[in-house]
Every structure is written in C-alpha cells, then in structure tokens.
Amino acid sequence: MADELGTTEREIIAQRLKKAEALRALGVNPFGNGWQPRHLADELLRHYGDQPAEEIAKDPGDWSLAGRVLAVRSFGKAAFLRVRDRSAELQVWVKKDRVGEQAFEVFKLLDIGDIVGAEGPATRTKTGELTLEARTFTILTKATRPLPEKWHGLTDVEQRYRQRYVDLVVTPGVREAFVKRARIVSGIRRFLDARGYLEVETPTLHKPEEAGGAAARPFETHHNALDLDLKLRIATELHLKRLVVGGLDRVYEIGRIWRNEGIDRRHNPEFTSIEFYQAYATHEDLMRLTEELMHRLAVEVTGGPVVTFQGQAIDLTPPFPRVSMLEVGARALGLSPDDALAGRGLAEALSRAAARENDSEDAWKLEQAAKKTPGEAVALAFEIFGEPQLPKDRPAFVVDFPLETSPLSRRRDADPRLVDRFELFAAGMELANAFSELNDPADQRARFEAQMRAKAAGDEEAMPYDEDFVRALEHGMPPTAGEGIGIDRLAMLFTDSASIRDVILFPLLKSRD
C-alpha cells in the first residue's frame, strides 16, 4: 500500500486509477459485484464480547464481513485494517501466509476508502483487540478519490453538508445521528399504528386555492400538460381533514413540506412533518397522547426520559407544565389579558415595548403589530418576551391562543376569544402544534374571508379561500383534534444537534459562485 501523504489530490486520483488497472491485470474487477457478506461487524463483537483469546480460540467461527477501510497499519507481510460496515468498526488482520500470494498482491493495491471483503476466524490480538483474521481477502470497490483522513472529519461545515456521503464516513457521530432520526420516524409509526391510526398519502402539488393549512409562503410551479399553476404544499392538514369527513377517523401522514421562507439553524425550506387527526377527541386528549409519545421516543431512542441538548438536561417525564400565551403576552406589554384582547391601551403598550427593545428587528415587529389585531399583537409579544422564559429543563405546553392566530382552530366554549390549541416547546424550539379542529362550515368560511382580506392588505402568509374544504365541512366532520410535529426539530432534540442541517441528509444550500 503506497503512502499518499504529500501529494496533490489529482496525483492521488491518478495513482488510484493505475491501481484499478493493476487489479484488473490480477483478474480482480475493481468495481465488481456478487460478493455478499454473511455477517455484520457488530455480530462478531457481540458474540465474543470480552472473552479472552483462549476462549475465542476454542470456537473462533467462520466470519464473513465487508466494509470500508478507514485506516491501515502495515508491517511488511502483514497489516491491520480498520473496517467499518453499517453496524460497527472492526479490526481485520491480513497476513500473506494466511491469505496467500495472490490475495496479498491484491492487498498491496489497497487504499484507505476502498471497500473490501474478508472471511476468516475471530481472534484477540496481543493488544487485546477483537479481530477477524482474514483467510480470504479481496477489494470489492476501489475508491478513486481519497477521503480527508488527515483530519478528524471534515473541518468545513459547508463542505460537510454538500458532501454528506463523505461526512457520513469520516465525521464521528454523523451516521449515528441519522440512525436515531430513522428510529424516531419508525417509533412514531409504531406508536400511532398501535392506536388504530391509518397512514395515508395526500398530494404534494396543490392548486392555488388548496395551498393552505399554515401561515407560510409556498413555492410555485407550473404543470405544462394541464397548463396549470400549482404550489408545493405547506401542510397536509386540509386534505387529512377531508379524509376524516369521509370516515377515516384516525389518520396520519409523514411527509415532506415546502415553505418559501428564510433559512437558519431551526428552519429549512424543505422539511418533514407528521400530522395526525383523531375524531371524537379534543386538544386535551392530544396533550396526553403527546406526553406519552415524547416520553416513549426519548426512552427508545436515547435510552431514558432525560435527554441532553447543548449542555441542558431536559426531562420528558409527563406531565408537562402549561404556560398561557394570553397571560404572559399581555403582562409583557403591561396590560391585563382582558384589556389586551379588547385593544385598550394596546397601541401605547406596543410603542413602549418597542422603545425598550434592544433587538432592532423585534422593535420593528412590535411597532408594526399596532396595525394587526389585538390577538396577533399578544401572540407577537409572547414570541418575543415569553418564549425565552419557557422552562429550560422541561418541555412546556403553550396554551390560551387568541382566536385571530388560528384560522383553523375551534373556538373555546368558555371563552370564544380564544381557541382550543396548544404548542409544545422544548430546547427553545416549537416541536408540535395542535388544536381541536374547527368543524363549523359557516365559521370556517368567515375565517377564510378574513384571511383573504389580510392577503389583500399585503399579508403573503395569509391562507387562500379553500371552497372545497368548506364544502367538505358542510357534509359534516365529527368533533376532531389534530396535531403536527416537526420531525427535523425532534431529531435535533434527540441527537443534541444545534442546527437543523445536522439532521437533514441533504439540506438546501446556496449555489457556489
């Protein structure tokens, strides 16, 4: 195996291409097929555990593994390889007198990053490391471009995201984070399936009047054959509720959502959500279900109910505390909840709050809130002043949402100024949004009309008027509660990832100039 240090990448690639030709000369296809491992590295490691060499020698087995070479220590006629498959890393010992002259000639053409196959018994070396002692050895795939093995992973964060295929190989913990993400999704599926929910698929391309379900700006496209303007969905909500009207009392969808908005450590324009709807349930029922789901996922994915996020321990043991948006938002403005919702003294309170706000963007938002409804102003005050004060060591349900913030939520019977809604926050992030669904078609029509007025006044995130959805409600939707959970942020929490890009395999990035 040649030393590649000190040469340019172009020279290394040229060297490796020559080695690929040398493999062909030996009768080995450097990009062959048909060699299948019978075992995983983790199986061998678990089988022998901490058994001493003497015990392993009594039953060394016949193991067959394949994986990528991460490191090589060569000693003339023998070498130790670090090989990783999808389960674990394992040391492989290649000796000329064990694998034979032909196979050792193949080995000498090996480079870090190559994918190899090896068969042989298990042993424990003098240094105490559990090892596969190769009886047969071959190169299955020649890597013609080198891995950045000189460094402990990629040092350029942008390069990590652009070349995730390399990041997964060389950066510690990345593979494990995405394995956890997959376990989160499968855990949610098991949880809902066990409770009688039906998984469905709804359209991702919406006609302009259907592109609702959230306050967000959609991406737009055009269908050439139908000469039809379309929008990528910003939520699955309205189609899922149509299914509840049709008698599918418990439905859910895990799917991609697109929102034409900014990018930061918690937002990506393309993300994954789970939305589920249950007839004959209230938002209170979903609070209890959410507590149970979060606790179970924490145990299944991390091994216990307490997770650590950026140095902060967060206990997901139910019940979760509740925080009133109305109470906190109004008090932050120096008003009583009743005065705030009635708009009494609200403009002056917003002006005072803006004057003392250090963040210029938040100050501008507070000034502009005087043009919005009182409920929207209270919600903004909570976002700016209340969210940073939410519990750090526990998730929390935010409740008592003003009516104007929730065009699809059911009014609260005891106080029609509010809606039956909650949001779940943890680690400073909104993880879930849920409410008892509005099923009064006349009320829904009126709220859509209010949204259209807001859109005409310049609100690009206002929802369109979906006449077909109102028609569906006129056929009768049973009392229903629904919830949406952001899979990506949930993965951030359970993998201790500071950026949403760390839990999306291929996040959207700017084009390189």
UniProtKB/Swiss-Prot annotation:
Its EC number is 6.1.1.6. Its cofactor is Mg(2+). Gene3D superfamilies: Bira Bifunctional Protein, Domain 2, Nucleic acid-binding proteins. InterPro entries: Aa-tRNA-synt_II, aa-tRNA-synth_II, aa-tRNA-synth_II/BPL/LPL, Lys-tRNA-ligase_II, Lys-tRNA-ligase_II_N, Lys-tRNA-synth_II_C, NA-bd_OB-fold, NA-bd_OB_tRNA. Keywords: Aminoacyl-tRNA synthetase, ATP-binding, Cytoplasm, Ligase, Magnesium, Metal-binding, Nucleotide-binding, Protein biosynthesis. Mg(2+) 1 binds at E423, E430. Its main location: cytoplasm. It is found in: Cytoplasm. Binds 3 Mg(2+) ions per subunit. GO terms for cellular component: cytosol. It is an enzyme of class 6 (ligase). GO terms for biological process: lysyl-tRNA aminoacylation. It catalyses: tRNA(Lys) + L-lysine + ATP = L-lysyl-tRNA(Lys) + AMP + diphosphate. It comes from the Bacteria. Transmembrane segments: none annotated. The keyword Magnesium applies. Mg(2+) 2 binds at E430. GO terms for molecular function: ATP binding; lysine-tRNA ligase activity; magnesium ion binding; tRNA binding. Belongs to the class-II aminoacyl-tRNA synthetase family. Homodimer. HAMAP family: Lys_tRNA_synth_class2. This is Lysine--tRNA ligase.
